């Protein structure tokens, strides 16, 4: 194999298997069927009104592992990530701070990308902002109006809504019952009881212009796009239907990812927007999920400013399984710093035990639904042997460091 993300080592890992949210089981990722083909992935990016917290970092770290494993398998990877720079939280924060929303978005996007680079998260092939995709969004909304999948509400502000029943398969990605959908829909800013809507779950596609709000021209009047259609338009215009993975945090399963898929499927007439739906668990702090609205954030930039090594932050997040909801703590960071020190000490030794078996096991664990706890445990075992007993393979320490860099993204 050759580690495509680093310098060369021989060998090749097993095909990637991931938990699919819509199927509720771990199964092979479709790109593995043809190793020479291009693997495609669309992951929802940030709404740039505040700094990157560890919940963001954990999500993008999970998809970074997928990116790295695909490269290790020999795939070319087309990875697209959006920036939701048209959204109420951004406008509200900019108004509160007395700054232009575009300046706030630009500043926070720059900080986000700097944080991601510090954590050695490979950048997407395309970063695409919603404001860069207005033409494509308008085309998508227009197609849904023409087909009858969308309608204009009779109101002072003629907003456009998507019919949740426009596709027969609506609901397959989340698998949630209607009561759960309604609860999550309202929690995420939906308006199930708005007068004039055909259905409670119908989702906003185009918000007609209001005084003091940004707006763009369209054949159906000035306004701005709804949340879900932004991602559908970006994914379809950059990748197309049938992408290998649609991903993001588990808090996006419904309504965001369900509606993004439904919009795309409705326009393209396809049964599935993506072949695999992958979602990362939430990171908590102070007994609650980390979120901007709650304010219980541990910021990547703050940890870095306090002197935490970015590789240790990464290792701390990798210590838990990507799908698990879990809590961050100062003890977790301390443990990661200690582990990083041990790994670096072992990697700097003049010789060590043979690494072929441990590299094969690490690849196998990662290929099995990104089982980073088992991969780390295997590496800890090699490091313990190296530090306690040494070894006779002069190439082993450097070879293992290269593997850790390429597969886990941890720089030794």
UniProtKB/Swiss-Prot annotation:
Classification via CDD domains: Anticodon_Ia_Cys_like, CysRS_core
Entry's Gene Ontology BP terms: cysteinyl-tRNA aminoacylation; mycothiol biosynthetic process
Swiss-Prot/TrEMBL cofactor(s): Zn(2+)
Residues reported in the UniProt entry to bind L-cysteinyl-5'-AMP: 44-47, 59, 82-84, 227, 249-251, 283
Cofactor detail note: Binds 1 zinc ion per subunit.
Motif ('KMSKS' region): 289-293
Keywords of this entry: ATP-binding, Ligase, Metal-binding, Nucleotide-binding, Zinc
Motif 'ERGGDP' region per UniProt: ranges: 187-192
Signal peptide bounds: none
Molecular-function GO terms, alphabetical: ATP binding; cysteine-glucosaminylinositol ligase activity; cysteine-tRNA ligase activity; zinc ion binding
Pfam families in UniProt: tRNA-synt_1e (PF01406)
Sequence motif 'HIGH' region, residues: 46-56
Binding site for Zn(2+): 44, 231, 256
Chemical reaction(s) catalysed: 1D-myo-inositol 2-amino-2-deoxy-alpha-D-glucopyranoside + L-cysteine + ATP = 1D-myo-inositol 2-(L-cysteinylamino)-2-deoxy-alpha-D-glucopyranoside + AMP + diphosphate + H(+)
Subunit structure: Monomer.
Function of the protein: Catalyzes the ATP-dependent condensation of GlcN-Ins and L-cysteine to form L-Cys-GlcN-Ins.
Name of this chain's protein: L-cysteine:1D-myo-inositol 2-amino-2-deoxy-alpha-D-glucopyranoside ligase
Gene: mshC
């Amino acid at each position: 194999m050759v580690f495509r993300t680093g310098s060369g080592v021989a060998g090749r890992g097993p095909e990637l298997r991931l938990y699919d949210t819509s199927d509720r089981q771990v199964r092979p990722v479709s790109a593995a069927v043809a190793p020479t083909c291009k693997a495609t992935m669309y992951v929802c990016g940030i709404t740039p009104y505040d700094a990157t917290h560890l919940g963001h970092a954990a999500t993008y770290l999970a998809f970074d592992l997928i990116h790295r494993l695909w490269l290790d398998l020999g795939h070319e990877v087309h990875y697209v990530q959006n920036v939701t720079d048209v959204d109420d939280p951004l406008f509200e924060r900019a108004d509160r701070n007395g700054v232009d929303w575009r300046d706030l978005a630009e500043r926070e996007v720059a900080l986000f990308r700097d944080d991601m680079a510090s954590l050695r998260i490979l950048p997407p092939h395309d970063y695409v902002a919603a404001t860069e995709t207005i033409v494509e969004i308008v085309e998508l909304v227009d197609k849904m109006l023409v087909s009858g999948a969308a309608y204009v509400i009779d109101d002072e502000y003629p907003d456009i809504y998507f019919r949740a029943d426009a596709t027969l398969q609506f609901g397959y990605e989340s698998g949630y019952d209607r009561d759960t959908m309604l609860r999550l829909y309202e929690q995420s800013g939906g308006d199930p009881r708005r007068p004039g809507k055909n259905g409670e779950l119908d989702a906003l596609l185009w918000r007609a212009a209001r005084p003091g709000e940004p707006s763009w021209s369209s054949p159906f009047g000035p306004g701005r796009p709804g949340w879900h259609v932004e991602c559908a338009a970006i994914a379809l215009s950059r990748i197309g239907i049938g992408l290998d993975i649609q991903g993001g945090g588990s808090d996006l399963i419904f309504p965001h990812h369900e509606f993004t898929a439904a919009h795309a499927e409705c326009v393209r007439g396809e049964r599935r927007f993506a072949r695999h739906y992958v979602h990362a668990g939430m990171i908590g702090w102070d007994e609650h999920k980390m979120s901007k609205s709650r304010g219980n954030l541990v910021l990547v930039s703050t940890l870095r400013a306090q002197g935490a090594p970015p590789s240790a932050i990464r290792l701390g997040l990798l210590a838990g399984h990507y799908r698990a909801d879990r809590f961050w703590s100062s003890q977790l960071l301390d443990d990661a710093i200690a582990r990083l020190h041990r790994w670096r000490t072992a990697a700097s030794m003049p010789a060590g035990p043979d690494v072929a078996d441990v590299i094969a096991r690490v690849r196998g664990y990662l290929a099995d639904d990104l089982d980073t706890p088992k991969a780390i445990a295997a590496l800890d075992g090699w490091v313990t042997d190296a530090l306690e007993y040494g070894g006779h393979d002069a190439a082993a320490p450097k070879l293992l460091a290269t593997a850790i860099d390429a597969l886990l993204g941890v720089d030794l």
